[in-house]
Protein backbone atom coordinates (compact mmCIF):
# COMPACT_ATOMS: atom_id res chain seq x y z
CA UNK A 1 0.00 0.00 0.00
CA UNK A 2 2.85 2.39 0.91
CA UNK A 3 4.64 1.64 -2.37
CA UNK A 4 1.42 2.23 -4.32
CA UNK A 5 0.86 5.59 -2.64
CA UNK A 6 4.49 6.54 -3.31
CA UNK A 7 4.16 5.57 -6.98
CA UNK A 8 0.93 7.58 -7.31
CA UNK A 9 2.59 10.59 -5.71
CA UNK A 10 5.59 10.31 -8.08
CA UNK A 11 3.23 10.05 -11.07
CA UNK A 12 1.38 13.22 -9.98
CA UNK A 13 4.68 15.10 -9.55
CA UNK A 14 5.85 13.92 -12.99
CA UNK A 15 2.58 15.06 -14.61
CA UNK A 16 2.80 18.43 -12.87
CA UNK A 17 6.39 18.95 -14.08
CA UNK A 18 5.44 17.95 -17.64
CA UNK A 19 2.60 20.48 -17.61
CA UNK A 20 4.95 23.18 -16.35
CA UNK A 21 7.54 22.40 -19.05
CA UNK A 22 4.88 22.42 -21.79
CA UNK A 23 3.73 25.87 -20.65
CA UNK A 24 7.34 27.08 -20.74
CA UNK A 25 7.37 28.07 -17.05
CA UNK A 26 10.74 26.43 -16.30
CA UNK A 27 11.35 28.50 -13.16
CA UNK A 28 8.22 27.07 -11.55
CA UNK A 29 9.75 23.58 -11.70
CA UNK A 30 11.98 24.53 -8.78
CA UNK A 31 8.86 24.64 -6.62
CA UNK A 32 8.96 20.86 -6.80
CA UNK A 33 12.38 21.09 -5.09
CA UNK A 34 14.20 19.31 -7.88
CA UNK A 35 17.58 20.32 -6.55
CA UNK A 36 16.78 19.25 -3.00
CA UNK A 37 16.42 15.59 -3.96
CA UNK A 38 12.62 15.40 -3.79
CA UNK A 39 12.58 14.61 -7.52
CA UNK A 40 13.73 11.02 -7.53
CA UNK A 41 15.34 9.10 -10.38
CA UNK A 42 12.03 7.41 -11.18
CA UNK A 43 10.29 10.79 -11.51
CA UNK A 44 13.03 12.20 -13.76
CA UNK A 45 12.87 9.11 -15.97
CA UNK A 46 9.08 9.35 -16.16
CA UNK A 47 9.19 13.06 -17.08
CA UNK A 48 11.78 12.43 -19.81
CA UNK A 49 9.63 9.59 -21.16
CA UNK A 50 6.36 11.55 -21.17
CA UNK A 51 7.88 14.68 -22.71
CA UNK A 52 9.15 12.58 -25.64
CA UNK A 53 5.53 11.80 -26.58
CA UNK A 54 4.85 15.41 -27.52
CA UNK A 55 6.16 15.12 -31.09
CA UNK A 56 4.58 18.45 -31.98
CA UNK A 57 7.29 20.10 -29.92
CA UNK A 58 10.09 18.69 -32.05
CA UNK A 59 10.49 15.02 -31.22
CA UNK A 60 12.88 14.50 -28.32
CA UNK A 61 13.77 18.19 -27.98
CA UNK A 62 11.67 18.74 -24.83
CA UNK A 63 13.03 15.58 -23.19
CA UNK A 64 16.58 16.55 -24.11
CA UNK A 65 16.13 20.16 -22.88
CA UNK A 66 14.74 18.90 -19.58
CA UNK A 67 17.58 16.35 -19.29
CA UNK A 68 20.22 19.07 -19.84
CA UNK A 69 18.49 21.53 -17.52
CA UNK A 70 18.16 18.98 -14.71
CA UNK A 71 21.81 18.03 -15.10
CA UNK A 72 22.81 21.70 -14.64
CA UNK A 73 21.23 21.94 -11.18
CA UNK A 74 23.84 22.08 -8.37
CA UNK A 75 22.79 18.98 -6.42
CA UNK A 76 21.29 17.00 -9.27
CA UNK A 77 22.87 14.06 -11.02
CA UNK A 78 21.18 11.81 -13.53
CA UNK A 79 20.84 8.17 -12.59
CA UNK A 80 21.75 5.27 -14.83
CA UNK A 81 18.05 4.70 -15.60
CA UNK A 82 17.28 8.30 -16.60
CA UNK A 83 20.41 8.53 -18.77
CA UNK A 84 19.61 5.19 -20.43
CA UNK A 85 16.03 6.34 -21.10
CA UNK A 86 17.31 9.53 -22.70
CA UNK A 87 19.70 7.57 -24.94
CA UNK A 88 16.87 5.32 -26.13
CA UNK A 89 14.61 8.30 -26.87
CA UNK A 90 17.35 10.02 -28.87
CA UNK A 91 18.01 6.79 -30.76
CA UNK A 92 14.31 6.28 -31.51
CA UNK A 93 14.16 9.74 -33.11
CA UNK A 94 17.42 9.08 -35.01
CA UNK A 95 19.47 11.67 -33.10
CA UNK A 96 22.32 9.16 -33.30
CA UNK A 97 25.27 11.49 -32.76
CA UNK A 98 23.89 12.95 -29.51
CA UNK A 99 22.80 9.52 -28.28
CA UNK A 100 26.21 8.07 -29.07
CA UNK A 101 28.02 10.86 -27.19
CA UNK A 102 25.78 10.43 -24.14
CA UNK A 103 26.33 6.66 -24.18
CA UNK A 104 30.12 7.12 -24.27
CA UNK A 105 29.95 9.40 -21.21
CA UNK A 106 27.70 6.92 -19.42
CA UNK A 107 30.02 3.98 -20.24
CA UNK A 108 32.97 5.89 -18.79
CA UNK A 109 31.05 6.60 -15.57
CA UNK A 110 29.03 3.42 -14.99
CA UNK A 111 29.84 -0.30 -15.03
CA UNK A 112 27.49 -0.97 -17.93
CA UNK A 113 29.10 -4.29 -18.85
CA UNK A 114 27.87 -5.95 -15.66
CA UNK A 115 25.31 -8.62 -16.68
CA UNK A 116 23.15 -7.56 -13.72
CA UNK A 117 23.14 -3.92 -14.84
CA UNK A 118 22.45 -4.83 -18.46
CA UNK A 119 19.52 -7.05 -17.47
CA UNK A 120 18.05 -4.28 -15.31
CA UNK A 121 18.30 -1.79 -18.17
CA UNK A 122 16.57 -4.12 -20.61
CA UNK A 123 13.98 -5.32 -18.10
CA UNK A 124 13.15 -1.84 -16.88
CA UNK A 125 11.85 -0.48 -20.19
CA UNK A 126 9.42 -1.59 -22.86
CA UNK A 127 11.22 -0.12 -25.84
CA UNK A 128 11.47 -0.86 -29.52
CA UNK A 129 13.84 -3.89 -29.77
CA UNK A 130 15.64 -2.23 -32.69
CA UNK A 131 16.45 0.82 -30.53
CA UNK A 132 17.78 -1.36 -27.71
CA UNK A 133 19.82 -3.40 -30.21
CA UNK A 134 21.17 -0.17 -31.69
CA UNK A 135 22.35 1.14 -28.31
CA UNK A 136 23.81 -2.21 -27.23
CA UNK A 137 25.67 -2.40 -30.55
CA UNK A 138 27.22 1.01 -29.86
CA UNK A 139 28.20 -0.25 -26.43
CA UNK A 140 29.89 -3.29 -28.00
CA UNK A 141 31.86 -0.97 -30.27
CA UNK A 142 32.80 1.36 -27.39
CA UNK A 143 34.25 -1.45 -25.26
CA UNK A 144 35.97 -3.20 -28.18
CA UNK A 145 37.71 0.00 -29.32
CA UNK A 146 38.72 0.78 -25.73
CA UNK A 147 40.48 -2.60 -25.57
CA UNK A 148 37.92 -3.91 -23.05
CA UNK A 149 37.27 -7.08 -25.04
CA UNK A 150 35.64 -9.08 -22.26
CA UNK A 151 33.16 -6.26 -21.59
CA UNK A 152 32.28 -6.12 -25.28
CA UNK A 153 31.66 -9.89 -25.28
CA UNK A 154 29.42 -9.57 -22.19
CA UNK A 155 27.27 -7.00 -24.03
CA UNK A 156 27.16 -9.29 -27.08
CA UNK A 157 25.97 -12.19 -24.90
CA UNK A 158 23.32 -9.95 -23.32
CA UNK A 159 22.02 -9.06 -26.78
CA UNK A 160 21.77 -12.79 -27.54
CA UNK A 161 19.98 -13.59 -24.29
CA UNK A 162 17.40 -10.87 -25.01
CA UNK A 163 16.65 -12.36 -28.42
CA UNK A 164 17.99 -9.26 -30.16
CA UNK A 165 20.34 -9.01 -33.13
CA UNK A 166 23.57 -6.97 -32.90
CA UNK A 167 24.42 -4.68 -35.78
CA UNK A 168 26.90 -5.92 -38.36
CA UNK A 169 29.36 -3.09 -37.67
CA UNK A 170 29.46 -3.96 -33.95
CA UNK A 171 30.20 -7.61 -34.75
CA UNK A 172 32.94 -6.57 -37.19
CA UNK A 173 34.62 -4.29 -34.63
CA UNK A 174 34.47 -6.98 -31.92
CA UNK A 175 35.88 -9.68 -34.22
CA UNK A 176 38.65 -7.34 -35.38
CA UNK A 177 39.60 -6.51 -31.77
CA UNK A 178 39.75 -10.22 -30.94
CA UNK A 179 42.03 -10.84 -33.93
CA UNK A 180 44.36 -8.03 -32.82
CA UNK A 181 44.58 -9.68 -29.39
CA UNK A 182 45.28 -13.04 -31.12
CA UNK A 183 42.21 -14.58 -29.46
CA UNK A 184 41.46 -16.61 -32.58
CA UNK A 185 39.48 -19.37 -30.81
CA UNK A 186 37.10 -16.75 -29.45
CA UNK A 187 36.82 -15.19 -32.92
CA UNK A 188 35.31 -18.37 -34.34
CA UNK A 189 32.96 -18.84 -31.37
CA UNK A 190 31.62 -15.29 -31.67
CA UNK A 191 31.30 -15.63 -35.45
CA UNK A 192 29.20 -18.82 -35.14
CA UNK A 193 26.91 -17.19 -32.57
CA UNK A 194 26.64 -14.09 -34.74
CA UNK A 195 25.51 -16.16 -37.75
CA UNK A 196 22.93 -18.00 -35.61
CA UNK A 197 21.47 -14.63 -34.62
CA UNK A 198 20.88 -13.87 -38.28
CA UNK A 199 23.76 -11.44 -38.83
CA UNK A 200 24.84 -11.82 -42.46
CA UNK A 201 28.61 -11.57 -42.93
CA UNK A 202 29.88 -9.13 -45.56
CA UNK A 203 33.31 -8.68 -47.14
CA UNK A 204 34.61 -6.78 -44.08
CA UNK A 205 33.69 -9.62 -41.70
CA UNK A 206 35.25 -12.22 -44.01
CA UNK A 207 38.42 -10.14 -44.30
CA UNK A 208 38.66 -10.05 -40.50
CA UNK A 209 38.25 -13.85 -40.43
CA UNK A 210 40.92 -14.34 -43.12
CA UNK A 211 43.17 -12.08 -41.03
CA UNK A 212 42.49 -14.38 -38.05
CA UNK A 213 43.70 -17.30 -40.19
CA UNK A 214 46.82 -15.28 -40.96
CA UNK A 215 47.48 -14.68 -37.26
CA UNK A 216 47.14 -18.39 -36.49
CA UNK A 217 49.08 -19.43 -39.62
CA UNK A 218 46.21 -21.50 -41.01
CA UNK A 219 46.01 -21.13 -44.83
CA UNK A 220 43.72 -24.17 -45.16
CA UNK A 221 41.04 -22.49 -43.08
CA UNK A 222 41.50 -19.28 -45.05
CA UNK A 223 40.95 -21.20 -48.30
CA UNK A 224 37.71 -22.66 -46.91
CA UNK A 225 36.57 -19.14 -46.07
CA UNK A 226 37.22 -18.03 -49.66
CA UNK A 227 35.12 -20.92 -50.94
CA UNK A 228 32.35 -20.01 -48.51
CA UNK A 229 32.49 -16.39 -49.65
CA UNK A 230 32.12 -17.35 -53.29
CA UNK A 231 29.18 -19.66 -52.47
CA UNK A 232 27.41 -16.79 -50.71
CA UNK A 233 28.11 -14.28 -53.45
CA UNK A 234 30.66 -12.28 -51.43
CA UNK A 235 33.57 -11.57 -53.75
CA UNK A 236 37.12 -11.47 -52.30
CA UNK A 237 38.87 -8.11 -52.66
CA UNK A 238 42.53 -7.08 -52.73
CA UNK A 239 42.78 -7.30 -48.92
CA UNK A 240 41.42 -10.87 -48.91
CA UNK A 241 43.87 -12.08 -51.54
CA UNK A 242 46.85 -10.20 -50.07
CA UNK A 243 46.22 -11.65 -46.62
CA UNK A 244 46.08 -15.20 -48.00
CA UNK A 245 49.24 -14.63 -50.07
CA UNK A 246 50.98 -13.31 -46.95
CA UNK A 247 50.01 -16.45 -44.98
CA UNK A 248 51.45 -18.73 -47.65
CA UNK A 249 54.64 -16.67 -47.98
CA UNK A 250 55.22 -16.72 -44.21
CA UNK A 251 54.96 -20.52 -44.31
CA UNK A 252 57.35 -20.68 -47.31
CA UNK A 253 54.54 -22.05 -49.49
CA UNK A 254 55.45 -19.88 -52.47
CA UNK A 255 53.86 -22.07 -55.15
CA UNK A 256 50.50 -21.83 -53.35
CA UNK A 257 50.98 -18.07 -52.94
CA UNK A 258 51.61 -17.69 -56.68
CA UNK A 259 48.48 -19.76 -57.37
CA UNK A 260 46.45 -17.32 -55.26
CA UNK A 261 47.92 -14.41 -57.23
CA UNK A 262 46.88 -16.14 -60.46
CA UNK A 263 43.31 -16.62 -59.17
CA UNK A 264 43.30 -13.03 -58.03
CA UNK A 265 44.25 -11.67 -61.46
CA UNK A 266 41.77 -13.97 -63.25
CA UNK A 267 39.00 -12.60 -61.02
CA UNK A 268 39.86 -9.08 -62.15
CA UNK A 269 41.72 -7.95 -59.02
CA UNK A 270 45.12 -6.47 -59.91
CA UNK A 271 48.06 -7.02 -57.54
CA UNK A 272 49.31 -3.96 -55.67
CA UNK A 273 52.57 -3.21 -53.90
CA UNK A 274 51.39 -5.09 -50.78
CA UNK A 275 51.11 -8.23 -52.93
CA UNK A 276 54.67 -7.85 -54.23
CA UNK A 277 56.00 -6.98 -50.76
CA UNK A 278 54.59 -10.24 -49.35
CA UNK A 279 56.46 -12.29 -51.97
CA UNK A 280 59.65 -10.25 -51.58
CA UNK A 281 59.50 -10.61 -47.79
CA UNK A 282 58.95 -14.37 -48.05
CA UNK A 283 61.89 -14.90 -50.40
CA UNK A 284 64.17 -12.49 -48.50
CA UNK A 285 63.46 -14.19 -45.18
CA UNK A 286 64.66 -17.48 -46.68
CA UNK A 287 67.74 -15.90 -48.23
CA UNK A 288 66.42 -16.40 -51.77
CA UNK A 289 67.54 -12.96 -52.88
CA UNK A 290 67.68 -13.88 -56.58
CA UNK A 291 63.92 -14.57 -56.62
CA UNK A 292 63.23 -11.52 -54.44
CA UNK A 293 65.20 -9.25 -56.78
CA UNK A 294 63.53 -10.76 -59.85
CA UNK A 295 60.11 -9.98 -58.40
CA UNK A 296 61.28 -6.47 -57.54
CA UNK A 297 62.27 -5.90 -61.16
CA UNK A 298 58.96 -7.35 -62.39
CA UNK A 299 56.86 -4.81 -60.49
CA UNK A 300 54.43 -3.44 -63.08
CA UNK A 301 54.38 0.16 -64.26
CA UNK A 302 51.12 0.97 -62.48
CA UNK A 303 52.54 -0.27 -59.16
CA UNK A 304 55.30 1.66 -57.39
CA UNK A 305 57.83 0.15 -54.99
CA UNK A 306 57.57 1.78 -51.58
CA UNK A 307 59.57 2.21 -48.40
CA UNK A 308 58.68 -1.32 -47.22
CA UNK A 309 59.90 -2.87 -50.50
CA UNK A 310 63.37 -1.38 -50.25
CA UNK A 311 63.70 -2.00 -46.51
CA UNK A 312 62.74 -5.67 -46.98
CA UNK A 313 65.35 -6.14 -49.71
CA UNK A 314 68.03 -4.33 -47.71
CA UNK A 315 67.31 -6.54 -44.70
CA UNK A 316 67.45 -9.64 -46.91
CA UNK A 317 70.86 -8.74 -48.34
CA UNK A 318 72.18 -7.98 -44.85
CA UNK A 319 71.06 -11.42 -43.68
CA UNK A 320 72.85 -12.96 -46.69
CA UNK A 321 76.09 -11.16 -45.78
CA UNK A 322 75.94 -8.89 -48.83
CA UNK A 323 76.30 -5.55 -47.06
CA UNK A 324 77.60 -3.84 -50.21
CA UNK A 325 74.40 -4.61 -52.14
CA UNK A 326 72.36 -3.48 -49.12
CA UNK A 327 74.19 -0.15 -49.06
CA UNK A 328 73.75 0.23 -52.84
CA UNK A 329 70.01 -0.37 -52.51
CA UNK A 330 69.83 2.24 -49.79
CA UNK A 331 71.28 4.78 -52.23
CA UNK A 332 68.72 3.74 -54.87
CA UNK A 333 65.99 4.05 -52.25
CA UNK A 334 67.03 7.62 -51.43
CA UNK A 335 67.35 8.56 -55.11
CA UNK A 336 63.71 7.44 -55.60
CA UNK A 337 62.59 9.84 -52.87
CA UNK A 338 62.23 7.34 -50.01
CA UNK A 339 64.01 8.28 -46.79
CA UNK A 340 65.38 5.27 -44.88
CA UNK A 341 63.76 4.98 -41.47
CA UNK A 342 64.99 3.47 -38.25
CA UNK A 343 64.00 -0.06 -39.42
CA UNK A 344 66.20 0.29 -42.53
CA UNK A 345 69.13 1.60 -40.51
CA UNK A 346 68.70 -1.17 -37.92
CA UNK A 347 69.14 -3.86 -40.59
CA UNK A 348 72.40 -2.32 -41.83
CA UNK A 349 73.59 -1.56 -38.30
CA UNK A 350 72.99 -5.16 -37.22
CA UNK A 351 75.10 -6.50 -40.08
CA UNK A 352 77.94 -4.03 -39.46
CA UNK A 353 78.01 -4.99 -35.78
CA UNK A 354 77.94 -8.72 -36.61
CA UNK A 355 80.99 -8.16 -38.82
CA UNK A 356 82.76 -6.23 -36.06
CA UNK A 357 82.71 -3.00 -38.10
CA UNK A 358 81.93 -0.85 -35.07
CA UNK A 359 83.43 2.37 -36.49
CA UNK A 360 81.18 2.17 -39.54
CA UNK A 361 78.24 1.43 -37.26
CA UNK A 362 79.00 4.59 -35.28
CA UNK A 363 79.23 6.61 -38.51
CA UNK A 364 75.80 5.27 -39.40
CA UNK A 365 74.52 6.44 -36.01
CA UNK A 366 75.92 9.91 -36.66
CA UNK A 367 74.16 9.91 -40.03
CA UNK A 368 70.89 8.94 -38.33
CA UNK A 369 71.31 11.78 -35.86
CA UNK A 370 71.94 14.24 -38.70
CA UNK A 371 68.71 13.13 -40.37
CA UNK A 372 66.77 13.42 -37.09
CA UNK A 373 66.06 9.66 -37.05
CA UNK A 374 65.67 8.60 -33.43
CA UNK A 375 67.26 5.26 -32.45
CA UNK A 376 64.83 2.73 -30.97
CA UNK A 377 65.31 -0.22 -28.62
CA UNK A 378 66.56 -2.43 -31.46
CA UNK A 379 69.21 0.15 -32.42
CA UNK A 380 70.49 0.45 -28.86
CA UNK A 381 70.33 -3.28 -28.12
CA UNK A 382 72.29 -4.01 -31.30
CA UNK A 383 75.05 -1.63 -30.19
CA UNK A 384 75.05 -2.83 -26.58
CA UNK A 385 75.33 -6.43 -27.74
CA UNK A 386 78.13 -5.56 -30.18
CA UNK A 387 80.18 -3.78 -27.50
CA UNK A 388 79.58 -6.61 -25.01
CA UNK A 389 80.85 -9.16 -27.54
CA UNK A 390 84.15 -7.30 -27.94
CA UNK A 391 84.26 -6.81 -24.13
CA UNK A 392 84.05 -3.00 -24.37
CA UNK A 393 81.76 -2.58 -21.38
CA UNK A 394 82.53 1.13 -21.01
CA UNK A 395 80.97 1.83 -24.41
CA UNK A 396 78.10 -0.59 -23.72
CA UNK A 397 77.24 1.29 -20.52
CA UNK A 398 77.43 4.62 -22.39
CA UNK A 399 74.86 3.36 -24.89
CA UNK A 400 72.70 2.17 -21.99
CA UNK A 401 72.81 5.62 -20.38
CA UNK A 402 71.99 7.39 -23.66
CA UNK A 403 69.14 4.95 -24.16
CA UNK A 404 67.64 5.85 -20.77
CA UNK A 405 68.23 9.60 -21.27
CA UNK A 406 66.34 9.50 -24.57
CA UNK A 407 63.29 8.01 -22.84
CA UNK A 408 63.75 4.42 -24.01
CA UNK A 409 63.35 1.59 -21.51
CA UNK A 410 65.74 -1.31 -21.19
CA UNK A 411 64.09 -4.57 -22.18
CA UNK A 412 64.97 -8.22 -21.61
CA UNK A 413 67.49 -8.21 -24.48
CA UNK A 414 69.29 -5.13 -23.11
CA UNK A 415 69.71 -6.72 -19.69
CA UNK A 416 70.78 -10.11 -21.03
CA UNK A 417 73.44 -8.54 -23.25
CA UNK A 418 74.84 -6.46 -20.36
CA UNK A 419 74.84 -9.41 -17.92
CA UNK A 420 76.60 -11.60 -20.47
CA UNK A 421 79.13 -8.85 -21.20
CA UNK A 422 79.97 -8.22 -17.55
CA UNK A 423 80.29 -11.97 -16.92
CA UNK A 424 82.73 -12.29 -19.85
CA UNK A 425 85.02 -9.63 -18.37
CA UNK A 426 84.44 -11.10 -14.88
CA UNK A 427 82.86 -7.90 -13.52
CA UNK A 428 80.40 -10.01 -11.60
CA UNK A 429 79.20 -7.31 -9.20
CA UNK A 430 78.04 -5.25 -12.16
CA UNK A 431 76.47 -8.36 -13.68
CA UNK A 432 74.56 -8.95 -10.44
CA UNK A 433 73.32 -5.35 -10.37
CA UNK A 434 71.97 -5.73 -13.89
CA UNK A 435 70.34 -9.02 -12.88
CA UNK A 436 68.59 -7.42 -9.89
CA UNK A 437 67.51 -4.45 -11.98
CA UNK A 438 66.17 -6.83 -14.62
CA UNK A 439 64.06 -8.71 -12.07
CA UNK A 440 62.82 -5.49 -10.41
CA UNK A 441 61.59 -4.32 -13.82
CA UNK A 442 59.49 -7.49 -14.14
CA UNK A 443 61.66 -9.56 -16.51
CA UNK A 444 62.40 -13.22 -15.81
CA UNK A 445 66.01 -14.35 -16.32
CA UNK A 446 66.32 -17.68 -18.08
CA UNK A 447 68.73 -20.56 -17.78
CA UNK A 448 71.35 -18.85 -19.96
CA UNK A 449 71.46 -15.75 -17.73
CA UNK A 450 72.05 -17.76 -14.56
CA UNK A 451 74.57 -19.95 -16.41
CA UNK A 452 76.75 -16.93 -17.23
CA UNK A 453 76.84 -15.91 -13.56
CA UNK A 454 77.60 -19.45 -12.35
CA UNK A 455 80.40 -19.79 -14.93
CA UNK A 456 81.80 -16.43 -13.84
CA UNK A 457 81.88 -17.43 -10.18
CA UNK A 458 83.56 -20.77 -10.98
CA UNK A 459 86.11 -19.07 -13.25
CA UNK A 460 87.10 -16.91 -10.28
CA UNK A 461 86.99 -19.88 -7.87
CA UNK A 462 84.23 -18.11 -5.93
CA UNK A 463 81.71 -20.90 -5.55
CA UNK A 464 80.45 -19.43 -2.26
CA UNK A 465 79.28 -16.33 -4.14
CA UNK A 466 76.40 -18.40 -5.49
CA UNK A 467 75.10 -18.90 -1.94
CA UNK A 468 75.62 -15.19 -1.26
CA UNK A 469 73.65 -14.40 -4.41
CA UNK A 470 70.67 -16.26 -2.97
CA UNK A 471 71.03 -14.38 0.32
CA UNK A 472 71.20 -11.07 -1.53
CA UNK A 473 67.92 -11.87 -3.26
CA UNK A 474 66.26 -12.05 0.14
CA UNK A 475 67.97 -8.89 1.43
CA UNK A 476 66.64 -6.93 -1.54
CA UNK A 477 63.15 -8.28 -1.00
CA UNK A 478 63.22 -10.30 -4.21
CA UNK A 479 61.74 -13.76 -4.47
CA UNK A 480 64.32 -16.55 -4.64
CA UNK A 481 61.88 -18.87 -6.35
CA UNK A 482 62.11 -22.30 -7.97
CA UNK A 483 63.07 -20.70 -11.30
CA UNK A 484 66.22 -19.22 -9.70
CA UNK A 485 67.23 -22.50 -8.06
CA UNK A 486 66.45 -24.38 -11.28
CA UNK A 487 68.79 -22.17 -13.31
CA UNK A 488 71.63 -22.39 -10.79
CA UNK A 489 71.31 -26.15 -10.17
CA UNK A 490 71.16 -26.97 -13.89
CA UNK A 491 74.37 -25.10 -14.62
CA UNK A 492 76.20 -26.42 -11.56
CA UNK A 493 75.28 -29.97 -12.59
CA UNK A 494 76.58 -29.27 -16.08
CA UNK A 495 79.89 -28.25 -14.50
CA UNK A 496 79.91 -31.67 -12.76
CA UNK A 497 79.60 -30.11 -9.30
CA UNK A 498 76.65 -32.25 -8.25
CA UNK A 499 77.60 -32.22 -4.55
CA UNK A 500 77.26 -28.44 -4.45
CA UNK A 501 74.04 -28.71 -6.47
CA UNK A 502 72.75 -30.97 -3.68
CA UNK A 503 73.58 -28.25 -1.11
CA UNK A 504 71.47 -25.74 -3.06
CA UNK A 505 68.72 -28.32 -3.53
CA UNK A 506 68.51 -28.98 0.22
CA UNK A 507 68.54 -25.23 0.91
CA UNK A 508 65.63 -24.82 -1.50
CA UNK A 509 63.58 -27.59 0.13
CA UNK A 510 64.20 -26.15 3.63
CA UNK A 511 62.58 -22.91 2.44
CA UNK A 512 59.47 -24.82 1.49
CA UNK A 513 60.11 -24.64 -2.24
CA UNK A 514 59.27 -27.83 -4.11
CA UNK A 515 61.58 -28.95 -6.89
CA UNK A 516 60.12 -29.65 -10.31
CA UNK A 517 60.82 -32.27 -12.98
CA UNK A 518 63.67 -30.20 -14.44
CA UNK A 519 65.58 -30.01 -11.15
CA UNK A 520 65.10 -33.67 -10.23
CA UNK A 521 65.91 -35.02 -13.71
CA UNK A 522 68.97 -32.75 -14.06
CA UNK A 523 70.39 -33.84 -10.70
CA UNK A 524 69.54 -37.49 -11.37
CA UNK A 525 71.48 -37.39 -14.64
CA UNK A 526 74.40 -35.58 -12.98
CA UNK A 527 74.60 -38.43 -10.45
CA UNK A 528 74.12 -41.06 -13.17
CA UNK A 529 76.95 -39.84 -15.39
CA UNK A 530 79.36 -39.78 -12.41
CA UNK A 531 78.46 -43.36 -11.51
CA UNK A 532 76.30 -42.52 -8.47
CA UNK A 533 73.37 -44.67 -9.53
CA UNK A 534 72.02 -45.10 -5.98
CA UNK A 535 71.64 -41.33 -5.53
CA UNK A 536 69.99 -41.05 -8.95
CA UNK A 537 67.55 -43.84 -8.08
CA UNK A 538 66.63 -42.10 -4.81
CA UNK A 539 65.67 -39.00 -6.81
CA UNK A 540 63.61 -41.17 -9.18
CA UNK A 541 61.72 -42.51 -6.15
CA UNK A 542 60.82 -38.97 -5.08
CA UNK A 543 59.77 -38.10 -8.62
CA UNK A 544 57.50 -41.14 -8.76
CA UNK A 545 55.91 -40.35 -5.40
CA UNK A 546 55.33 -36.71 -6.39
CA UNK A 547 54.04 -37.68 -9.85
CA UNK A 548 56.76 -35.67 -11.59
CA UNK A 549 57.11 -36.75 -15.22
CA UNK A 550 59.71 -36.09 -17.92
CA UNK A 551 58.00 -34.29 -20.81
CA UNK A 552 59.20 -34.03 -24.41
CA UNK A 553 60.71 -30.57 -23.95
CA UNK A 554 62.79 -31.71 -20.95
CA UNK A 555 63.87 -34.87 -22.76
CA UNK A 556 65.11 -32.86 -25.75
CA UNK A 557 66.77 -30.22 -23.56
CA UNK A 558 68.86 -32.68 -21.53
CA UNK A 559 69.68 -34.75 -24.62
CA UNK A 560 70.93 -31.60 -26.39
CA UNK A 561 72.91 -30.37 -23.34
CA UNK A 562 74.75 -33.69 -23.06
CA UNK A 563 74.84 -34.57 -26.76
CA UNK A 564 78.27 -36.21 -26.43
CA UNK A 565 77.10 -38.72 -23.82
CA UNK A 566 75.32 -41.03 -26.28
CA UNK A 567 75.68 -44.34 -24.44
CA UNK A 568 75.21 -42.84 -20.97
CA UNK A 569 72.12 -40.96 -22.13
CA UNK A 570 70.62 -44.04 -23.75
CA UNK A 571 70.95 -46.11 -20.57
CA UNK A 572 69.70 -43.20 -18.46
CA UNK A 573 66.53 -42.67 -20.52
CA UNK A 574 65.92 -46.40 -20.63
CA UNK A 575 66.03 -46.48 -16.83
CA UNK A 576 63.71 -43.45 -16.62
CA UNK A 577 61.28 -45.34 -18.85
CA UNK A 578 61.51 -48.45 -16.67
CA UNK A 579 60.62 -46.29 -13.66
CA UNK A 580 57.46 -45.08 -15.47
CA UNK A 581 58.64 -41.47 -15.35
CA UNK A 582 58.32 -40.81 -19.05
CA UNK A 583 55.29 -41.07 -21.33
CA UNK A 584 54.89 -43.60 -24.13
CA UNK A 585 54.85 -40.85 -26.76
CA UNK A 586 58.30 -39.69 -25.65
CA UNK A 587 59.56 -43.26 -25.64
CA UNK A 588 58.41 -43.52 -29.26
CA UNK A 589 60.29 -40.29 -30.01
CA UNK A 590 63.41 -41.80 -28.41
CA UNK A 591 63.07 -44.94 -30.51
CA UNK A 592 62.69 -42.89 -33.70
CA UNK A 593 65.82 -40.93 -32.78
CA UNK A 594 67.78 -44.13 -32.29
CA UNK A 595 66.62 -45.46 -35.67
CA UNK A 596 67.73 -42.25 -37.34
Curated annotation (Swiss-Prot):
Coiled coil: none annotated. PPR repeats lie at residues 132-166, 167-201, 202-236, 237-271, 272-302, 306-340, 341-375, 376-410, 411-445, 446-480, 481-515, 516-550. Transmembrane segments: none annotated. Signal peptide: none annotated. Gene3D superfamilies: Tetratricopeptide repeat domain. InterPro entries: Mito_RNA_Proc_CCM1 (IPR051114), Pentatricopeptide_rpt (IPR002885), TPR-like_helical_dom_sf (IPR011990). Keywords: Repeat. Pfam families: PPR, PPR_1, PPR_2, PPR_3. It comes from the Eukaryota. The keyword Repeat applies. The keyword Repeat applies. NCBIfam families: PPR. PANTHER family: MITOCHONDRIAL GROUP I INTRON SPLICING FACTOR CCM1-RELATED, PENTATRICOPEPTIDE REPEAT-CONTAINING PROTEIN PET309, MITOCHONDRIAL. Belongs to the PPR family. P subfamily. This is Pentatricopeptide repeat-containing protein At5g38730. It comes from Arabidopsis thaliana.
